[in-house]
Amino acid sequence: MGDAEKGKKIFIQKCAQCHTVEKTGKHKTGPNLWGLFGRKTGQAPGFSYTDANKSKGIVWGEDTLFEYLENPKKYIPGTKMIFAGIKKKNERLDLIAYLKKSTSE
């Protein structure tokens, strides 16, 4: 498992421009990520997803996020997420640790 404090820095640098994590957070260019773990792709209430995201049908968890965050457009062809991915394994683990902590109570 990664380091949530390091993951927070990665989130701020690479994700916060488009995403929020707080329970009352607003959608930005990307969806609010509160409740991410255990939710199916394309299911954040009130966010307009591509058909590719809605039909992917996987449930977000550590393993699926680990693979997705390496190369989002390869994992979900047709996603509108304009992020190249995080190639370093330890950075993905840190980010996932932060997301797990910050997107649930």
UniProtKB/Swiss-Prot annotation:
Keywords in alphabetical order: Acetylation, Electron transport, Heme, Iron, Metal-binding, Mitochondrion, Respiratory chain, Transport
Residues that bear N-acetylglycine: 2
InterPro entries: Cyt_c-like_dom, Cyt_c-like_dom_sf, Cyt_c_1A/1B
Annotated heme c binding sites: 15, 18-19, 81
Keyword Hydrolase: no
UniProt KW Transferase keyword: no
GO CC entries: mitochondrial intermembrane space
Post-translational events: Binds 1 heme c group covalently per subunit.
Family recorded in the similarity comment: Belongs to the cytochrome c family.
UniProt function note: Electron carrier protein. The oxidized form of the cytochrome c heme group can accept an electron from the heme group of the cytochrome c1 subunit of cytochrome reductase. Cytochrome c then transfers this electron to the cytochrome oxidase complex, the final protein carrier in the mitochondrial electron-transport chain.
Name of the molecule in the record: Cytochrome c, somatic A
Lineage, uppermost ranks: Eukaryota, Metazoa, Chordata, Craniata, Vertebrata
